[in-house]
Amino acid sequence: MKKLKMKYMAMAVMVLGIATVSFFACRFTKENKDSNIYGVDLSHHNCVEDWDQVTASFVYLKATEGATHQDETFKRFAHNAQKRGILVGAYLFMTTSSSSEEQFQNFHQATAGIKMDLIPVIDIERQTKGYKVSGNELRKRVRVFVNLCKKHYGKNPIIYCSQPFYTKNFLGHFNDCQYWCGDVNAPVVLYHAIHQKTIKKVAGIKGNVDYNILNCKLKEIQL
Protein backbone atom coordinates (compact mmCIF):
# COMPACT_ATOMS: atom_id res chain seq x y z
CA MET A 1 0.00 0.00 0.00
CA LYS A 2 2.83 2.38 0.90
CA LYS A 3 4.63 1.66 -2.38
CA LEU A 4 1.41 2.18 -4.32
CA LYS A 5 0.81 5.47 -2.53
CA MET A 6 4.35 6.61 -3.35
CA LYS A 7 3.81 5.61 -6.98
CA TYR A 8 0.63 7.69 -7.21
CA MET A 9 2.36 10.65 -5.56
CA ALA A 10 5.22 10.43 -8.06
CA MET A 11 2.74 10.34 -10.94
CA ALA A 12 0.89 13.34 -9.52
CA VAL A 13 4.13 15.32 -9.25
CA MET A 14 5.02 14.42 -12.83
CA VAL A 15 1.59 15.47 -14.14
CA LEU A 16 1.76 18.72 -12.16
CA GLY A 17 5.21 19.39 -13.57
CA ILE A 18 4.04 18.85 -17.14
CA ALA A 19 1.02 21.08 -16.56
CA THR A 20 3.21 23.81 -15.07
CA VAL A 21 5.65 23.70 -17.98
CA SER A 22 2.77 23.78 -20.46
CA PHE A 23 1.17 26.73 -18.67
CA PHE A 24 4.31 28.84 -18.71
CA ALA A 25 5.60 27.70 -22.09
CA CYS A 26 4.06 30.76 -23.72
CA ARG A 27 6.36 33.06 -21.75
CA PHE A 28 9.41 31.00 -20.77
CA THR A 29 11.56 29.27 -23.35
CA LYS A 30 15.08 29.00 -24.69
CA GLU A 31 16.42 31.43 -27.23
CA ASN A 32 16.72 30.27 -30.82
CA LYS A 33 20.47 30.60 -31.18
CA ASP A 34 20.39 29.32 -34.78
CA SER A 35 18.37 32.24 -36.14
CA ASN A 36 20.17 34.00 -38.96
CA ILE A 37 17.44 36.54 -39.65
CA TYR A 38 18.28 39.96 -38.29
CA GLY A 39 16.75 43.40 -38.36
CA VAL A 40 17.55 46.91 -37.18
CA ASP A 41 15.49 49.63 -35.55
CA LEU A 42 16.07 53.21 -36.60
CA SER A 43 15.02 56.76 -35.79
CA HIS A 44 16.21 60.32 -36.44
CA HIS A 45 19.21 59.47 -34.26
CA ASN A 46 20.52 57.22 -37.05
CA CYS A 47 22.05 58.11 -40.40
CA VAL A 48 21.69 55.64 -43.26
CA GLU A 49 24.51 56.36 -45.70
CA ASP A 50 23.75 53.68 -48.30
CA TRP A 51 20.52 51.65 -48.22
CA ASP A 52 21.89 49.33 -50.92
CA GLN A 53 24.44 48.02 -48.41
CA VAL A 54 21.89 47.31 -45.67
CA THR A 55 21.30 43.54 -45.61
CA ALA A 56 18.74 43.43 -42.80
CA SER A 57 15.63 41.34 -43.46
CA PHE A 58 13.45 43.79 -41.55
CA VAL A 59 13.56 47.26 -40.07
CA TYR A 60 11.45 48.87 -37.37
CA LEU A 61 11.24 52.64 -37.62
CA LYS A 62 10.31 55.08 -34.89
CA ALA A 63 7.07 56.75 -35.94
CA THR A 64 6.04 58.65 -32.84
CA GLU A 65 6.70 59.45 -29.20
CA GLY A 66 3.78 60.22 -26.94
CA ALA A 67 0.81 62.17 -28.29
CA THR A 68 2.56 64.93 -30.24
CA HIS A 69 6.02 64.00 -31.52
CA GLN A 70 6.40 62.44 -34.98
CA ASP A 71 9.79 61.26 -36.20
CA GLU A 72 10.81 63.22 -39.27
CA THR A 73 12.76 60.31 -40.80
CA PHE A 74 9.95 57.74 -40.65
CA LYS A 75 8.43 58.04 -44.13
CA ARG A 76 11.74 58.63 -45.89
CA PHE A 77 13.32 55.60 -44.22
CA ALA A 78 10.22 53.51 -44.91
CA HIS A 79 10.20 54.32 -48.64
CA ASN A 80 13.93 53.66 -49.00
CA ALA A 81 13.78 50.36 -47.13
CA GLN A 82 10.74 49.00 -48.97
CA LYS A 83 12.24 50.02 -52.31
CA ARG A 84 15.04 47.54 -51.54
CA GLY A 85 12.80 44.73 -50.35
CA ILE A 86 13.34 45.24 -46.63
CA LEU A 87 10.21 44.59 -44.56
CA VAL A 88 9.12 47.70 -42.64
CA GLY A 89 7.35 48.13 -39.32
CA ALA A 90 6.67 51.13 -37.08
CA TYR A 91 7.00 51.66 -33.36
CA LEU A 92 5.62 54.11 -30.85
CA PHE A 93 7.68 55.23 -27.87
CA MET A 94 4.86 55.20 -25.31
CA THR A 95 4.73 57.71 -22.46
CA THR A 96 2.61 57.98 -19.34
CA SER A 97 2.07 61.72 -19.74
CA SER A 98 -0.81 61.40 -22.23
CA SER A 99 -3.68 59.03 -22.93
CA SER A 100 -3.41 55.88 -25.01
CA GLU A 101 -6.11 57.18 -27.34
CA GLU A 102 -4.14 60.37 -28.06
CA GLN A 103 -0.94 58.43 -28.59
CA PHE A 104 -2.59 55.97 -30.94
CA GLN A 105 -4.12 58.80 -32.96
CA ASN A 106 -0.68 60.38 -33.32
CA PHE A 107 0.80 57.03 -34.36
CA HIS A 108 -1.99 56.37 -36.85
CA GLN A 109 -1.55 59.81 -38.44
CA ALA A 110 2.24 59.53 -38.64
CA THR A 111 2.12 56.16 -40.39
CA ALA A 112 -0.67 57.08 -42.82
CA GLY A 113 0.34 56.50 -46.43
CA ILE A 114 2.84 53.77 -45.56
CA LYS A 115 1.73 50.18 -46.12
CA MET A 116 3.44 48.54 -43.17
CA ASP A 117 4.71 44.99 -43.57
CA LEU A 118 5.20 44.25 -39.89
CA ILE A 119 3.07 44.29 -36.75
CA PRO A 120 3.26 47.65 -34.88
CA VAL A 121 5.39 47.83 -31.73
CA ILE A 122 4.82 49.54 -28.39
CA ASP A 123 8.18 50.61 -26.98
CA ILE A 124 7.59 51.14 -23.26
CA GLU A 125 10.89 51.08 -21.40
CA ARG A 126 10.01 53.26 -18.43
CA GLN A 127 7.41 55.63 -17.04
CA THR A 128 7.59 59.33 -17.82
CA LYS A 129 9.24 61.39 -15.09
CA GLY A 130 6.58 63.20 -13.08
CA TYR A 131 3.77 61.06 -14.51
CA LYS A 132 4.24 57.75 -12.74
CA VAL A 133 1.16 55.52 -12.56
CA SER A 134 0.40 52.26 -10.76
CA GLY A 135 1.12 48.92 -12.40
CA ASN A 136 -2.59 48.32 -12.81
CA GLU A 137 -3.10 51.70 -14.49
CA LEU A 138 -0.12 51.09 -16.77
CA ARG A 139 -1.59 47.77 -17.86
CA LYS A 140 -4.94 49.42 -18.54
CA ARG A 141 -3.28 52.02 -20.76
CA VAL A 142 -1.29 49.46 -22.68
CA ARG A 143 -4.42 47.33 -23.11
CA VAL A 144 -6.28 50.30 -24.59
CA PHE A 145 -3.48 50.77 -27.13
CA VAL A 146 -3.44 47.03 -27.87
CA ASN A 147 -7.18 47.04 -28.55
CA LEU A 148 -6.91 50.06 -30.84
CA CYS A 149 -4.10 48.37 -32.79
CA LYS A 150 -6.14 45.20 -33.15
CA LYS A 151 -9.12 47.21 -34.40
CA HIS A 152 -7.15 49.18 -37.00
CA TYR A 153 -4.43 46.74 -38.08
CA GLY A 154 -6.04 43.38 -37.40
CA LYS A 155 -3.31 42.18 -35.02
CA ASN A 156 -2.14 42.94 -31.50
CA PRO A 157 1.08 44.94 -31.28
CA ILE A 158 4.43 43.60 -30.11
CA ILE A 159 5.58 44.89 -26.71
CA TYR A 160 9.21 46.04 -26.41
CA CYS A 161 10.89 46.47 -23.02
CA SER A 162 13.46 44.87 -20.73
CA GLN A 163 12.76 41.55 -19.02
CA PRO A 164 12.65 43.09 -15.51
CA PHE A 165 10.14 45.73 -16.67
CA TYR A 166 8.04 43.12 -18.47
CA THR A 167 8.08 40.72 -15.53
CA LYS A 168 7.10 43.45 -13.07
CA ASN A 169 4.31 44.99 -15.12
CA PHE A 170 3.07 42.69 -17.88
CA LEU A 171 3.83 39.02 -17.18
CA GLY A 172 0.62 37.01 -17.30
CA HIS A 173 -1.42 39.96 -18.60
CA PHE A 174 -0.38 40.19 -22.25
CA ASN A 175 0.06 36.64 -23.47
CA ASP A 176 -1.90 37.70 -26.56
CA CYS A 177 0.95 40.04 -27.55
CA GLN A 178 4.38 39.00 -28.76
CA TYR A 179 7.39 40.20 -26.79
CA TRP A 180 10.53 41.96 -28.03
CA CYS A 181 13.29 41.67 -25.45
CA GLY A 182 15.35 44.82 -25.04
CA ASP A 183 18.11 43.33 -22.87
CA VAL A 184 21.32 43.87 -24.83
CA ASN A 185 24.13 41.30 -24.46
CA ALA A 186 22.15 39.39 -21.85
CA PRO A 187 20.55 35.93 -21.61
CA VAL A 188 16.83 35.80 -22.31
CA VAL A 189 14.50 33.79 -20.06
CA LEU A 190 11.15 35.05 -21.31
CA TYR A 191 9.73 33.75 -24.57
CA HIS A 192 10.34 36.39 -27.21
CA ALA A 193 9.73 36.97 -30.90
CA ILE A 194 12.66 39.38 -31.24
CA HIS A 195 15.77 40.03 -29.17
CA GLN A 196 17.82 43.21 -29.30
CA LYS A 197 20.93 41.10 -29.23
CA THR A 198 23.56 43.79 -29.32
CA ILE A 199 24.53 47.20 -30.65
CA LYS A 200 26.99 47.03 -33.51
CA LYS A 201 28.15 48.41 -36.83
CA VAL A 202 25.94 47.44 -39.79
CA ALA A 203 27.00 48.07 -43.39
CA GLY A 204 25.36 51.13 -44.91
CA ILE A 205 24.52 52.80 -41.59
CA LYS A 206 26.76 55.36 -39.88
CA GLY A 207 27.86 54.42 -36.37
CA ASN A 208 26.49 51.60 -34.26
CA VAL A 209 22.88 50.48 -34.48
CA ASP A 210 20.49 48.22 -32.57
CA TYR A 211 20.96 44.68 -33.95
CA ASN A 212 17.92 42.47 -33.47
CA ILE A 213 17.68 38.70 -33.92
CA LEU A 214 14.40 37.07 -34.90
CA ASN A 215 13.39 34.22 -32.60
CA CYS A 216 10.35 33.07 -34.57
CA LYS A 217 9.29 32.69 -38.19
CA LEU A 218 9.30 35.95 -40.10
CA LYS A 219 5.64 35.53 -41.02
CA GLU A 220 4.75 35.62 -37.31
CA ILE A 221 5.61 39.32 -37.07
CA GLN A 222 4.07 40.27 -40.40
CA LEU A 223 0.72 42.00 -40.82
Summary of predicted features, one role per range:
Residues 29-53, 173-223:
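Functionally critical loop-and-helix segments that line ligand-binding/catalytic clefts
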Residues 108-128, 170-191:
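Structural recognition of alpha->loop->beta junctions
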Residues 19-33:
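Bacterial Sec-dependent signal peptides at the C-terminal "C-region" and cleavage site
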Residues 88, 155-157, 179:
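Hydrophobic anchor at the start of a short beta-strand
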Residues 1-15:
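N-terminal Sec-pathway targeting helices
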Residues 153-167:
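Aromatic-lined carbohydrate-recognition surfaces of secreted/lumenal glycan-active proteins
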Residues 29-55, 60-146, 150-152:
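Substrate-binding cleft of extracellular glycoside hydrolase catalytic domains
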Residues 100, 165-173:
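Glycine-rich, charge-decorated loop segments at or immediately adjacent to ligand/cofactor-binding or catalytic sites
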